[in-house]
Amino acid sequence: MSYQKQQKPTLTGQRFKTRKRDEKERFDPSQFQESIVQGLNQTGTDLEAVAKFLDSSGAKLDYRRYAETLFDILVAGGMLAPGGALSDDMTRTKYCVFTAQEDIKTMKAYAQVFNKLIRRYKYLEKGFEEEIKKLLLFLKGFSESERNKLAMLTGVLLGNGSLSAAILSSLFNDNLVKEGVSPAFAVKLFKSWISEKDINSVAGSLRKVSMDNRLMELFPVNKRSYEHFSRYFTGAGLKEISDFARNQQSLGARKELQKELQEQISLGVSFKEIIDYCKEEMKRSSISEQLMIGIMWTSLMSDMEWNKKEELVTEQAIKHLKQHSPLLKAFSTQAQSELSLLQRIQEFCYDNIHFMKTFQKMVLLLYKVDVLSEEAVLKWFTEAHLAKGKSVFLEQMKTFVEWLKNAEEESESEEESD
């Protein structure tokens, strides 16, 4: 008996229906641009209609592939050539950011168009940030009016969280800085940003992406000083930015001072040399005694390897503070400095759980060696303590405070009898 091998079925000639979700027209940049430009020309200056058009077009146009083209058109009216000029061989629209009215109200309305688009098509978020970075690099190729509009728009978008402050890195481009384009653009941008949010919010956004210490880079190296920065931004009506830069400069100086102090303490440099060095730095960097006592405390306590056992760490801390108390005494000559020190001790003990029971012993020691006065301790107890662990620390201090009050009363009665 012979068996004929059965043939397997083949797929030749079979046609499969494409799923609806995969039916997306493929465009090259020129076709894509024509579709967007045509839609924008039809919607005109009605930004609500523009937003609806962009929302619906995403279903049939490939926004993911042509994100750069899309954003070029919305901002400049057409595809941009390197340097910022519009490509000559492409269709363009007169309805875009650069041809709109140069005022904050109009730019806020355009910001809403971008917000709606990116909320609807989340994948455009990264491409939009890259677009703004590119546009900032092209600033020299734009007119002053176009720069102003872009600055206002960017400030609003930074304020409402649609952009990260990391885009500001483009403003540190050497050519933009040398031509003075960067600081002029930054003024418009910060005014717009601060009108959306306060300076604290702006500062937080800058810190988040490590831009807080780079603002001086908006100026050429030979003008990169706080004095020049302050004159420029204060003169432009942005004292908040000027003050922020000053605080950052001071913060940087304090960090360097603390680092140097820790090194000097660990090397066993004499107290006199350390105190003299600190006083010079205080003058040079305009650091108050109130700030200095905090820096000294942090430096002293950061220099140690602390025992993990609670019963041993107290003894270790008291010994360490007693030995270095002259360093604290040198910078606690004012009532406010003493209160600042007490608050720093409170924070330290709260943040380091092994020290929770050590607070009272530290304060008592510093009182005995004349770093802290009776008045400062009483004021801290009654009104100047922090919220951190206050119930624990106030309870610890009750007996000592009662003793101080009684001693004060006895002293007063003795004076009266005399």
Swiss-Prot record:
Superkingdom of this protein's organism: Eukaryota
Keywords noted in UniProt: Activator, Transcription, Transcription regulation, Translation regulation
GO terms classed as biological process: regulation of translational initiation
Presence of the UniProt keyword Transcription in the record: yes
Record InterPro entries: ARM-type_fold, eIF5-mimic_regulator, W2_BZW1/2, W2_domain
Start and end residues of each W2 domain: 247-414
Residue ranges of the region described as Disordered: 1-29
Pfam families associated with the record: HEAT_5MP1_2, W2
KW Transcription regulation (keyword) present: yes
Signal peptide range in chain numbering: none
GO terms for cellular component: cytoplasm
Stretches with biased composition (Polar residues): 1-15
Physiological role: Translation initiation regulator which may repress repeat-associated non-AUG (RAN) initiated translation probably by acting as a competitive inhibitor of eukaryotic translation initiation factor 5 (EIF5) function. Enhances histone H4 gene transcription but does not seem to bind DNA directly.
Family stated for the protein in its record: Belongs to the BZW family.
The protein, known as: eIF5-mimic protein 2-B
